[in-house]
Amino acid sequence: MDATQIAAIDRLLELLPTFEDPEFVPAVWPERFHIDAEGKRIEHVPYPDYHPAVEEFRNRYPALVAGIHPYDALPEDDTPDGVTFSVLGTTYDQAYFAKATIDQIRRYLMLLGRGERFCDGHIDGEFRAEKVVAALKRLAEMYR
């Protein structure tokens, strides 16, 4: 782990108290529509408006994940096959994070971004399932 990555971890962990607040809402899903020239309501595909702290998280985590492949196997993986590709994003259960290594957390964060690219709201779902917080707590455990 180099100094740049440790600084990236510190910057991510600065956000953890906000994410742990019981009142924290990672995103809202406003109605998206417009009224056309004929007065007809036109619905839009929904997408979230993320909390500013989530947007900051999305700006900060790339400094930590640079250089990790999202699907290749890591030596510490349970199987030699790596992560199965999924257009909707790969996800893990809560137990995964209790033992995850730094590279497994880095890969998870990389996959968060990939999941969001192909599925608006993926990051919201991972926050609501408390997986992002679990990943950050594991980082804190390993590096603080």
Q: Language-model segments: what does each one mean?
A:
Residues 3, 20-30, 41, 73, ...:
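Charged, low-complexity interaction regions
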Residues 73-82:
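Low-complexity, small/polar and acidic-rich linker and loop segments
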Residues 2-9, 85-103:
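Short, charge/polar-rich alpha-helical segments
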Residues 38-40, 81-82, 89:
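Intrinsic-disorder/low-complexity loop/linker signature
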Residues 2-66, 72:
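Short terminal alpha-helical segments
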